Amino acid sequence: MSPELIQNLVTSYFSSLQAMNAVEWAENFTKDAVIYDPVGKPPSKARENAQAFFGLLSMAFEKLELSQDNVFIADNGAAVKWTMRVLGKSGKQGVAEGISVFEMHESGKFQQVSSYWNDAALMAQIKD
């Protein structure tokens, strides 16, 4: 798989997440893909649970901005160090950093994404 294809898919993942576009985001995954977001919580089926996942995002965040700080592509995968800035429904701002590891399927879509970050710390920043 070409590094360009992987980079394009990673960019699509982050841009659709930032836009809170569940349909576009789900298209980045194979039918049976799983996500660990964050790692340590039970896995979720990306396509099957996309609407529920984005429903939770839209309940918590007024605005979501993501930057791909560093992207490392190797073989059929990528690791991305990212920064997320949010405006909570509370009106408070929050910032989180993390690393997401993307595993590609031969079909050119993600088969697994594992994200390492502290979601509880971000939610504490925007709590009423």
Question: Which sequence ranges carry the predicted segments?
Answer:
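Short, cysteine-centered beta-strand-loop-beta hairpins and adjacent loop/turn segments enriched
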Residues: 59, 85-95
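Short, surface-exposed coil-to-beta transition loops
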Residues: 65-66, 81, 94-100
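Short beta-strand edge/turn micro-motifs at domain boundaries
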Residues: 97, 101-124
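A short hydrophobic beta-strand element
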Residues: 75-84
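Short, low-complexity N-terminal intrinsically disordered segments enriched in polar/charged residues
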Residues: 1-27, 31, 126-128
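A solvent-exposed, acidic/Ser-Thr-rich amphipathic alpha-helical stretch
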Residues: 5, 23-75
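A short, polar/proline- and glycine-enriched secondary-structure boundary/capping micro-motif
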Residues: 90-93, 121-127
